[in-house]
């Protein structure tokens, strides 16, 4: 039972890492990345549909995304959705494909994005600490209910803290890597 608490905490922390990676993927680093378009939904035959389900997204050059709709009639809808998004990229359509040229980042923009990355990383660490708190509370409840001994509680708390420390270290590494990527010229 005690191991289940640690395993559940590990699993929840793993989900936090995946969410962080997804959020970092949405922060543009001055080079083309298909994940920039992951959050864009297009109204396609009256239904909000993720862009990657109605078009192929390729990267022909370092700073260019090429969006090729499977159905050419959806080109205008895709263009409208990209314009409405908060990407800050203007789509250029030639009738069959949409080219998105990713502008080079200014030094100021890079610093702002690095601050945003730090904030996202800090929020992920807060989520990890909340998971630790929940796991510790669960362990204390079990000890109070006499399901585990006081010694087992101490061991469990150490295990939970080790898992938490590893998760926070991983978040710090991910954040540092993304910051480095952003600040490269």
UniProtKB/Swiss-Prot annotation:
Q: One biological process GO term for this chain?
A: translational termination
What the entry lists under CDD domains is as follows: RRF
Cellular component aspect of the GO annotation: cytoplasm
Which SUPFAM superfamilies has this protein been placed in?
A: Ribosome recycling factor, RRF
State one molecular function term (GO).
ribosomal large subunit binding
* Compartment(s) of residence: Cytoplasm
The protein's UniProt keywords, in alphabetical order, are: Cytoplasm, Protein biosynthesis
Major location category of this protein: cytoplasm
Enumerate the NCBIfam families for this protein.
frr
Q: Which family does it belong to?
A: Belongs to the RRF family.
What does this protein do, in the record's words? Responsible for the release of ribosomes from messenger RNA at the termination of protein biosynthesis. May increase the efficiency of translation by recycling ribosomes from one round of translation to another.
- Could you tell me what this protein is called? Ribosome-recycling factor
According to the entry, what is the taxonomic lineage of the organism? Bacteria, Bacillati, Bacillota, Bacilli, Lactobacillales
